[in-house]
C-alpha cells in the first residue's frame, strides 16, 4: 500500500490589524461578509452558504447574522477592534449583519450604503407573476 506523504502546507501568517472595513454584500439570494484592512486586503470572509445554509434559507436575516458573526470572530483573531461598514445590495440581511458585527465585539465607527444605482443602465429582470 502506498504511503501517504504529508504535504508541507503554507501556514497562514497572522496579520495584526486594529482597524478595518466590513463589506456586506446582500443580494436577494445570499449575504457575503468580507472584512478587509484599510488597503483592501482580505482578512476574513463568510457567506450564508459557507456557514451551512442551503437554498432559500441563505436569504434570511438569521443566515446573514451567522455569516457576519463568523467573519467577525475570525477578524478579531487578527487583532481587529474597529470597522467601517460598507453595505451593498437590496437583500434581507443588511441590518442583521451590521447588528451581528456589533454583537460580536467589533466597534462600528461608520455605516455607508454603497449600493450601485444605475442612471438608466441595463434593463432589469422582468416582474415576477405569482
UniProtKB/Swiss-Prot annotation:
An annotated Gene Ontology molecular function: rRNA binding
Record-level GO BP terms: translation
Matches recorded under Pfam families: Ribosomal_S11
InterPro entries: Ribosomal_uS11 (IPR001971), Ribosomal_uS11_bac-type (IPR019981), Ribosomal_uS11_CS (IPR018102), Ribosomal_uS11_sf (IPR036967)
RNA-binding is among the record's keywords: yes
PROSITE patterns assigned to the protein according to its UniProt record, in alphabetical order: RIBOSOMAL_S11 (PS00054)
Gene Ontology cellular component list: ribonucleoprotein complex; ribosome
HAMAP family reported in the protein's UniProt record: Ribosomal_uS11
Main function: Located on the platform of the 30S subunit, it bridges several disparate RNA helices of the 16S rRNA. Forms part of the Shine-Dalgarno cleft in the 70S ribosome.
Assembly notes: Part of the 30S ribosomal subunit. Interacts with proteins S7 and S18. Binds to IF-3.
Protein name in UniProt: Small ribosomal subunit protein uS11
Organism this protein belongs to: Thermoanaerobacter pseudethanolicus (strain ATCC 33223 / 39E) (Clostridium thermohydrosulfuricum)
Gene label: rpsK
Amino acid at each position: 500500500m502506498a504511503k501517504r506523504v504529508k504535504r508541507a502546507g503554507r501556514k497562514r501568517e497572522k496579520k495584526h490589524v486594529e482597524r478595518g472595513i466590513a463589506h456586506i454584500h446582500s443580494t436577494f439570494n445570499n449575504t457575503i461578509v468580507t472584512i478587509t484592512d484599510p488597503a483592501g486586503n482580505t482578512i476574513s470572509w463568510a457567506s450564508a452558504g459557507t456557514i451551512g445554509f442551503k437554498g432559500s434559507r441563505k436569504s434570511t436575516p438569521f443566515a446573514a447574522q451567522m455569516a457576519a458573526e463568523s467573519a467577525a470572530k475570525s477578524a478579531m483573531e487578527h487583532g481587529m477592534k474597529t470597522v467601517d461598514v460598507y453595505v451593498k445590495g437590496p437583500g434581507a440581511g443588511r441590518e442583521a449583519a451590521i447588528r451581528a458585527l456589533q454583537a460580536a465585539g467589533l466597534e462600528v465607527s461608520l455605516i455607508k450604503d454603497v449600493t450601485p444605482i444605475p442612471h438608466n443602465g441595463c434593463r432589469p429582470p422582468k416582474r415576477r407573476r405569482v
